[in-house]
């Protein structure tokens, strides 16, 4: 890849190592400058505890994050045992979920036997089956002092301290970090902990709510320094050094949502070379609540002694039989999926026809939602070739909105942008005039919005503006244009928007640098030596209303934004005649008649839009007309495939039958209505049910129906003898797919802690920080239940990612040996690694490659 791209990947790869070179992936530099008032050993311990918290991005940049990311240096089973002990957080589905799959024969006896053999378990198949009928004992988190206090409290008439503490910290953090919604926020000059301490001294709400007068007085005795407060509390509660790490982890897990937000702030600070201590301060705040609840009594019958005694049965992470059973069922479910996936891929290799010379090439994002429409587009003609590539198309860019100071990253959240693009007409004077007009419109709009947010505006807005505003409300409710207004188009007229397109700003980007970037992107796309006359660069975005988590449905590789900017920027770069003339210096010659077209795949409605059509040469118009028809047909096919999961495949006024199936136009309108329905909690299923990642030529999987469960990345092993491209894929896109997979996994198995609960109860916090479920509790991270469950059952099956690569063993093993983060993911079973081998599949288990023997010829991966 180009140096600019390669450096971005390299910065990610270097920061991924879990060895002594700890950087922003595992222990952000921003946590290294701890207070000098604490002893060095405690400072190191606090840093290690804080480093276990994965970051959570804000709503407007919502990308998938694995909440387990900082624990991958331990085996999956060990992490599961620790989280169960610390936070009563499960890392498997429930036994009732496995029971349903067993009854439906999704999990078969052979799957159970294989799981038992892999783990060398002493548990028998009959024991596992019998466990499905037995009640599961509830899990409890590592007890804090507040739990023991609550055990002696009349909770029918008084609120629990545990809940009240979470609520107080959460409300304080919401006000402290809010820069958008609140009319007032606490002073941030003294830091999070010191500001909280000051608030506790003067805030009477806790005293009134909980009828506890001593809290305010005790708060005055807390040290002003966070590390000093941590040290004092550990000493006061007599936490032995051997227990401190576990105890501090348990404390921080009680406020894990805000901890993830603070970890994000530390992550961003690390990118900028700054120090950030918010996460340490948050730990100090939650720990000091234990201090405030301590009555000082230490004798027989005291709260403190009862609390200490409750630790006794929890002193070690010994084998938990119930957990072992659950983990074996989890592995059996994964084996069941792998059995079907591997059969489908083996069958696809046997039936794959010879590829023909492409007339159209279409590069899509690796997103699982692309698999469905790619398959339907390929079905339109044997001369259409589709490719898979990370949706930011290798451009490490930040997008600057014309006429504003607003900008946003358009690349994976793991990376830092190094280039800037902005909208331009190609004429500086016109750009300046356009920016001026846009700023004036924005000023008027936001002055009007300020009125919206006045306290009384809820009651006076319609009365003040009369029928004019009522008409606007009705239009927004009843109309559904094919493309909703986006941030990029906001405050532009349609004519103005059509006159601009994203372009690189004037910076040190020389022609040579742009040409080298273009050459290496073409190589990574796999079209350096062969191009069709028309090459589509297809970004993707979603279309929903009244959805604060909308960014989670957009392109994760573009940091939760639409991929339009990246696709249009790359198309402009590759169509630039000066760049094309310079490409031979980098070993690439494009055919003279190739034209690159930017496109956008609307994943909610399955619509496909082509951009900058006026720039397409007249010599390509006939081919373009044919392509339009093929795209329309592919969109309809994708809608038909998705319709049953959305209950849109029939006229609901009559029983389902062939006679009342919706026409193509009716189906399109049904999808549009759903996209514009303010009350729709499930506009689309996003990446629900993702389960695998294939790194191989499309020909390897083209004949397999993968049901939108598989990420697809183009890789041609014969063109990568040194393994450089495979290294980039396994250390960047593969890790991103792992994050996505684990976000969906965690939100399913533990939605209370790693999901965001009921979407209908969501309230936005701080403009874009995150969500509350209702008006309090911890900050909610991850996916809402409605994104995973249809009201009857789970739409997402929580399975660890299966990665299938078309490459020699030695090349794959070299990547693992060179990059510890990859080695940890594979050898600690956070994902599974397999490879194509001689018309079959082999999988890497317990350090060896094992040939897969297929008992079935089933050709669909369900």
From Swiss-Prot:
Name of a matching Pfam family: DabA
Record membrane topology: Peripheral membrane protein
Disulfide bonds, paired cysteine numbers: none
Cross-referenced InterPro entries: DabA
Record keywords, A-Z: Cell inner membrane, Cell membrane, Membrane, Metal-binding, Transport, Zinc
Binding positions for Zn(2+) per the UniProt entry: 365, 367, 540, 555
One GO cellular component term noted in the UniProt record for this chain: plasma membrane
Subcellular location field: Cell inner membrane
Cofactor(s) the protein requires to work: Zn(2+)
Molecular function as annotated in GO: zinc ion binding
Sections of the chain in a coiled coil: none
Chain's role: Part of an energy-coupled inorganic carbon pump.
Family: Belongs to the inorganic carbon transporter (TC 9.A.2) DabA family.
Subunit (UniProt): Forms a complex with DabB.
UniProt-recorded name of the protein: Probable inorganic carbon transporter subunit DabA
Organism: Vibrio cholerae serotype O1 (strain ATCC 39315 / El Tor Inaba N16961)
Name of the encoding gene: dabA
